[in-house]
Amino acid sequence: MIEMTETDLQRKHTGISEIREIVGIYEIDIEDLKYSPLKIKVIQILNASGDSYIGIANLTIKGKGCSGYYRSMHPQKTKEEALDDAVDGFFAYLSDESEIKVVKNW
């Protein structure tokens, strides 16, 4: 647990705009998926308005008829909700006709 708060760090170092902590990395095996496992990195964002969590997938997906690749990264209140959001966002576009790309420097 970090004892120093974001405000303490920002007072010391004015160039800090955001602090993130990696909460966990989850690997999800998906049947018949060439790029399996789907990996989700859940980070906690520490800021003055309260902590939030974001799930970040190592894969982006382009569904049939979509113009671009997608991965859900909406701030959530809990790490479980962040994991759910990232996985749900991936499966929302997954089909036999989807295109998938691995994210470099994930």
What is the role of each PLM region?
Residues M1-L38:
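Negatively charged, low-complexity tracts enriched in Asp/Glu with abundant Ser/Thr
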